[in-house]
Amino acid sequence: MFFNKKISIYVFLSLTLFFGFIFDENSSGGAKIDHKYLFPFIENFSYSLETGLKNFLSNSASLIHSPIFYLLISFLLKISNSLIFVSVFYLLLCLSLPLLFYQILKEKFKTDDIIIFYLSIIIFLSPYFRSSAIWLLGDNLSLIFFSASIIYFLKFEQDKEKRKLKE
């Protein structure tokens, strides 16, 4: 019962993100403008790596972002040739962030309590998470990589403790 309730809530909140995508939700207020400003960098990287890096490095405003996001998205754009496909793919990828956060909390606190689940899905209510997922901005990808690294760090720490106990 508890498991089905969690899945239902997660699916419902995921659907709200898809509805936000369909209706061009801009809950943070600046994501649509950021997308229009940053999308040419993605296009430049999809033409060629050299052109992309040249334009990226020549613009001081772009240097606050990592070029990895632009490289990954431009690669997807190049192979699919569809911005809608890339946007939906990125939206689906962003749906992993609450799951990763849930895994972090579960590993750290060694429990599968409902409170941990509710804490992890609060991410869906963040206007910045929603806007970044909907408008193809790199913030969520950074958080996904960071969360994955935390999970591996926690597992490493657990393994280290187990090895100490065996000695």
Region annotations inferred by a language model:
Residues 107-113, 149-166:
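Membrane-interface transmembrane helices that cradle and orient dolichyl/undecaprenyl
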Residues 4-39, 125:
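Transmembrane signal-anchor helices characteristic of membrane glycosylation enzymes that use polyprenol
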Residues 131-141:
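Short acidic/glycine- and proline-prone juxtamembrane loop motifs at membrane-interface regions
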Residues 8, 81-89, 111-119:
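Membrane-interface starts of transmembrane alpha-helices
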Residues 116-127, 131, 151:
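Short helix- or helix-capping micro-motifs
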Residues 85-109, 148, 152:
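Transmembrane-helix motifs of polytopic, lipid-linked glycan transferases
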Residues 18-20, 36-61, 68-71:
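Extracytosolic helix-loop segments that constitute the early lumenal/periplasmic catalytic or substrate-binding loops
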Residues 57, 63, 67-74, 79-96, ...:
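Loop-to-helix entry region of an early transmembrane alpha helix in multi-pass inner-membrane enzymes
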